[in-house]
């Protein structure tokens, strides 16, 4: 397991479109998950201990953000051949076990992870209502959550915090 940090936020970078299969067996595009006040895209997986340690907080934050008009979604881009715990079937179980209140999508070609330049799980991308990147940091160091506070700021002002601490987690497991 390689500990990887996210790069500094590239403020204003536009969200890239995608069309991925959800654990609800529906195709989901960027337009489908666009929130009135912002959009949170999270790259996660089932096996990473960093994700497992915060998954309840991710679900709680997504519920909180929904009340602010921010929609969240999670994308799993890992190589499932070498990491079978991240298989689509296990994604379905993982999302049910943790009561996901947001779509959980599989990026089996890893094209979306590459387009977003995702590097680890978890990797958070917080966009304003114009789908401009405003947050690329960690969920928290202590309470209240930095992710929740950043997304609330984005929802109310359209801008993310200037100071951001990188998220850390397992590297994306790339196909060979």
Where are the model-predicted features located?
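Chalcogenol-based redox active-site neighborhoods
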Residues: 1-164, 174-176
